[in-house]
Amino acid sequence: MVNIRPDEISSIIRQQIDKYDQAIQVSNVGTVLQIGDGIARVYGLDQVMAGELLEFEDKTIGIALNLESDNVGVVLMGEGRGILEGSSVKATGKIAQVPVGKSYLGRVVNALGTPIDGKGDINCSETRLIESIAPGIISRKSVCEPIQTGITAIDSMIPIGRGQRELIIGDRQTGKSSVAIDTIINQKGEDVVCVYVAVGQKAATVASIVTTLEEKGALDYTCIVAANADDPATLQYIAPYTGAAIAEYFMYNGQATLVIYDDLSKQASAYREMSLLLRRPPGREAFPGDVFYLHSRLLERAAKLSDKLGGGSMTALPVIETQAGDVSAYIPTNVISITDGQIFLSGDLFNAGIRPAINVGISVSRVGSAAQIKAMKQVAGKLKLELAQFAELEAFSQFASDLDQATRNQLARGQRLREILKQPQNSPISVEEQVAIIYTGINGYLDDIAVDKVRRFVTNLRTNLKNSKPQYAEIIRNTKTFNSDAENLLKSAIADTKQSFV
């Protein structure tokens, strides 16, 4: 007969009870009431946060945007074809994040940070919130360093500084993207990380931009975030924030960054589409009431950080497309009021062969000469005034038949100044050469050269300076000033070029 020992049995039971762990998994689950047009109405998610990520049964991710009393309006970040009415939705408890790191340089990714260039996965251990708070007042420093675009008209009259927000605005096909791409190409060797965000563009356009940057050797320090025209409105809406998050990683690590949002008109349209489908009340031009906040919270993330935070910077160049040159429409006026200046590209100038087609009259940089080296300040001071007076005289001279000699001289000078500011695409000019070109034009050295030969003369002068007067560029590069030695070298180069110029 088996001898039963009650004390042993009770100790075994006690041990089992001690080891028992009742793990309760609590998840916030809701039900899809309605689905269509990239929007889902979900019932039962009472504890969900604004902007929280939700997971549907088919693994599609959505963002909770509308929190109403009886349902939640969710925008889908994908096709969502497998989602049915009555299917379940789970709250993840997470806010949208994107992986960040140096591995993103030279890559093309979508709005969620997933590579779409066929070069394999990107390994990053760090992530950043897609929407993070902009640096505060104490964290910032005033803009004091230039970011050279390589475009003479911009660097001389509408200078851009590191940490500035400068709007590029104009009608379609006026060269807005070209200005942005030229600026990226000109950062070669400057230790500036560039992020190009393409919103609502054709895939072919993005592919040609990638090819251009690759040919010019600029893709190595650039990341491209693309939300193409056929992507859901949600991805077009979050793509600029993803680009800002990738750039912020480098900014907080003490590096200078440049972000181009091309373009924010399409982002606003995508946001309008989402808002109307979510039944938010429409305002002016059918945009929702918070469309200003859409752009301000994005552009306020651009900053020049204080030395305590590493002195990094994020320069933002948002692009806005106008309709028939109307800069007083809703989105253009909003973004003009948020940014620190604008570069206005005119269709009329573009068609007249003046490229880049910058309208100097209404283009402005609110940072001004703080974003220029001393050498540029010394020579470019008169340029904007001379061009403004020339534009006025040119309009007046169409009606007046006989003009005095002084007016004729001023018109001739103005035509030559306008000529030296013309520049072919993807051909940035170094700041030393820009100083030389402007000095030559402002001081009348081109007055005796025919207008149609000015550009050839300038090309010859640049070649002459590079080959026979390399000390000139060294002086400006090292001292950042246009001193008497540099001036004498330049005058000598101008004289030599004139002698050999036929």
UniProtKB/Swiss-Prot annotation:
Could you tell me where this protein is found in the cell? Plastid, Chloroplast thylakoid membrane
Catalysed reaction(s)? ATP + H2O + 4 H(+)(in) = ADP + phosphate + 5 H(+)(out)
Read off the InterPro entries from this record: ATP_synth_asu-like_sf, ATP_synth_asu_C, ATP_synth_asu_C_sf, ATP_synth_F1_a_nt-bd_dom, ATP_synth_F1_asu, ATPase_a/bsu_AS, ATPase_F1/V1/A1_a/bsu_N, ATPase_F1/V1/A1_a/bsu_N_sf
Which residues form each disulfide bond in the chain? none
Functionally, this protein is described as follows: Produces ATP from ADP in the presence of a proton gradient across the membrane. The alpha chain is a regulatory subunit.
Q: Which PROSITE patterns match?
A: ATPASE_ALPHA_BETA
Q: What is this protein called?
A: ATP synthase subunit alpha, chloroplastic
Name the keywords, alphabetized: ATP synthesis, ATP-binding, CF(1), Chloroplast, Hydrogen ion transport, Ion transport, Membrane, Nucleotide-binding, Plastid, Thylakoid, Translocase, Transport
Q: Does the keyword Thylakoid apply?
A: yes
GO cellular component terms, alphabetically, are:
chloroplast thylakoid membrane; proton-transporting ATP synthase complex
Provide the residue positions that the database annotates as binding ATP: 170-177
What's a single GO MF annotation on this record?
ATP binding
**The protein's Enzyme Commission number:** 7.1.2.2
Site Required for activity: give positions: 363
**Species this chain originates from:** Guillardia theta
Q: Which family does it belong to?
A: Belongs to the ATPase alpha/beta chains family.
Q: What class of enzyme is it?
A: translocase
Q: How does it assemble?
A: F-type ATPases have 2 components, CF(1) - the catalytic core - and CF(0) - the membrane proton channel. CF(1) has five subunits: alpha(3), beta(3), gamma(1), delta(1), epsilon(1). CF(0) has four main subunits: a, b, b' and c.
Annotated membrane topology: Peripheral membrane protein
